[in-house]
Structures are given as structure tokens and as C-alpha cells.
A protein has these predicted regions:
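N-terminal glycine-rich flavin-associated loop
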Residues: 87-106
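Conserved donor sugar-nucleotide recognition element shared by glycan-biosynthetic enzymes
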Residues: 41, 92, 133
Length: 349
């Protein structure tokens, strides 16, 4: 079966995104974006949306999208992962877009999705408690929503706030007015991942789902897991590329250190991990069953963590300086591994 991330259209999309990011999202630009008030380069995000249509990829055409799918969104996420470019792609375009589509609520989709697809509306999804699991942190009652949701992607700067909450019938998806909540940015290990805490206290909210959200939430979790796996694969591959390039340039004992057999073996081992991660991502996209998705979470996370660790080891002392990007890949590796639940829990399942 054809790899959905390696079709002619996918390769053209990859080339377009990579060309733009190479020109506009180099290491200095990435650091500047991380330190900006929004935590990302808004002009770059606008260009990605207007010229390439990245936010519209997984949204149907009748809601203002491109009518592609998760595989195409994963192509973009992998490229963003390569350069560690901070962007609202994961939280707004993928998670919130998917959440709205799974409500079965045409009115809400017609009202909210066109702005998300255009990249002019930034949406955030709140659900997780402090343990990072998918059990909704918020509780819905006649009085409104109560509780505290953690790890909300772009939650403090979002224009639209969606929340998954526990209900008497299981779970529901709610649209929450911004003036009714307290939103606080939190410092995280990864400076390129903007996270927030969202607190509700009898906050009035509008329920969007039709017929319950328990099963859609499971599918949304799978989508989120696959999307992060794509980012991990792209970042792991780039970490390996940078390491190989460095070992070809760095000389010791009169020859490039990459010519030493011990280092060749270590880089070959990273390559095997990266290719295994690509295969796991492919299986998750093509099969879509929960086991394949959980496998991708574990394999892709481990591959990225291994590539980032070896990047530091094989670069030597320069890799532990603030000016070098190795620590940013390392932080992204460990941050993404825990973003949608502990990999250890996935293994136990």
C-alpha cells in the first residue's frame, strides 16, 4: 500500500513547506519566535496558511478547508518538527478542527471551522488534568463547567476555547466564553511548546456535541497521538542529519570523527530507530487501529529521544551550550513524549 505521506501531492506539499521554513525559520528565527509574546511567528504562520493552506488541510471543503486529511497534516507537522518551528498547527488546526468535526454539529462547524482553516482564528482545546491523561479534568453541571485543565496548547492566546468535560452521559465538547475562565501560561521544559492552565468556576458553556463525545474523544486522542508522532519523526530525522553533518566536519587525530567505526555504528543505530519510527507512523496512518496508534506513540517517541541524546553525545561539549540547538531537540523530544499521556501507560495498555 502506498505511503500516504509519500504520494506525489504529499511530496509537493513537503517541498513547499520545507522551502518556506528553510528561508524563514532558521535557528535564529525559531529562537526569536519562541521568545515572542505569542510564542510563534504570526507572520510566518499567516504565510503558511495563505500561500500553502496548511491549517485547511484536514478540514472539509464545505467548511472552508482543503478537503485533504490527517496524512497531509502530518506532512506539515513533520516539517515543523524538523526545524522546531513553533506554530498553532497541532493545537488549533488539527486538534480543534478534528474535535469540531466529530461533534456532528453543522452550525458550530460552519461558524468556527472557516476561521481555523484560514489560520485567522486560533482555537485551543482543554481536557487534561495534571496527570496528562485523557480523562477530562473539567466537570459539567447545570451550573456550568468547573475544574482546572492543564497542558492546553496555546490556551492563553486562543480566540476560541473548546473544552472536553465529564457529563452525566460520559463526556461532552463545550464552547467556553473567554471572559468566563482564567487562563495562565505555564513554563514548560520545551520553550517551543506554549502551554497554559485553564480554570473554570461555574463557567457557563455551550455544549456542541450531538449524541455524546466519549467515542469521538477516543478517536480524537488517536488523531492527536499520530500528529505528534509525525512531528517526532521529522525532528528525529533532522537531529540525525545535523549529527552526521557535524561528524563529517569535526576533525580529531587528523581525520573526521565520523570516519571512526564506533561513531558510524552509533549513527547507524539512530538511523534504524528513525526508520522504525517512520514505519510505525505509516502503520498508524494506514491501519488506524488503537494498537497501531499506541505503537507509534512509543516507537516514535523513543526514536526521537534516542536521536536527541546521541546528538548531544556525538557533538561533544558544544552541544551543552545554550547557543547550540541540541538542547532544544532534547527538550522537544521529552516534551512530546509526555504531551498526550505517559508512554509507559501506552505500553501497559
Amino acid at each position: 500500500m502506498t505511503d500516504p505521506m509519500d504520494t506525489g501531492e504529499a511530496r509537493a506539499l513537503r517541498d513547499a513547506v520545507r522551502t518556506l521554513l528553510t528561508r524563514r525559520s532558521g535557528p535564529a528565527a525559531v529562537r526569536a519566535a519562541m521568545e515572542s509574546p505569542l510564542g510563534h511567528d504570526d507572520k510566518l504562520w499567516s504565510t503558511l496558511c495563505e500561500q500553502i493552506g496548511v491549517a485547511a488541510l484536514a478540514i472539509p471543503e464545505h467548511y472552508g478547508g482543503a478537503g485533504a486529511g490527517l496524512a497531509e497534516a502530518c506532512v506539515v507537522l513533520a516539517e515543523l518538527g524538523r526545524t522546531l518551528t513553533p506554530a498553532p498547527m497541532l493545537g488549533s488546526a488539527v486538534l480543534c478542527g478534528e474535535a469540531l468535526l466529530r461533534t456532528g454539529n453543522d452550525e458550530a462547524c460552519e461558524r468556527l471551522l472557516p476561521g481555523i482553516a484560514a489560520g485567522t482564528t486560533l482555537a485551543a482545546l482543554a481536557w487534561s488534568a495534571a496527570d496528562g491523561r485523557w480523562t477530562p479534568a473539567l466537570r459539567a453541571s447545570d451550573a456550568g463547567l468547573d475544574g482546572r485543565a492543564h497542558y492546553v496548547l496555546d490556551g492563553d492566546i486562543a480566540d476560541v476555547l473548546l473544552a472536553v468535560a465529564r457529563t452525566d452521559d460520559g463526556a461532552g465538547l463545550f464552547e467556553v466564553p473567554l471572559e468566563g475562565v482564567r487562563r495562565s501560561r505555564v513554563t514548560s521544559l520545551d520553550p517551543g511548546r506554549r502551554l497554559a492552565v485553564v480554570e473554570c468556576a461555574s463557567t457557563p458553556a455551550r455544549r456542541l456535541d450531538i449524541g455524546g463525545f466519549a467515542e469521538p474523544l477516543r478517536r480524537l486522542r488517536d488523531t492527536a497521538t499520530v500528529a505528534v508522532a509525525a512531528e517526532q519523526v521529522g525532528a528525529a530525522a533532522r537531529a540525525l542529519e545535523l549529527t552526521v553533518e557535524y561528524t563529517k566536519q569535526r576533525r580529531q587525530f587528523g581525520r573526521p570523527i565520523g570516519s571512526f567505526q564506533a561513531l558510524k555504528h552509533r549513527m547507524a543505530d539512530v538511523h534504524v530507530h528513525v526508520e522504525a519510527a517512520r514505519s510505525a507512523l505509516y502503520a498508524a496512518l494506514v491501519d488506524g487501529d488503537p494498537e497501531a496508534v499506541l505503537t507509534a506513540k512509543v516507537v516514535c517517541g523513543e526514536a526521537f529521544a534516542h536521536a536527541a541524546a546521541e546528538m548531544i553525545q556525538l557533538h561533544g561539549g558544544i552541544a551543552i551550550t545554550w547557543e547550540h540547538d541540541a538542547h532544544l531537540y532534547f527538550k522537544r523530544a521529552h516534551g512530546t513524549a509526555l504531551l498526550f499521556g505517559d508512554p509507559g501507560l501506552a505500553l501497559s495498555r
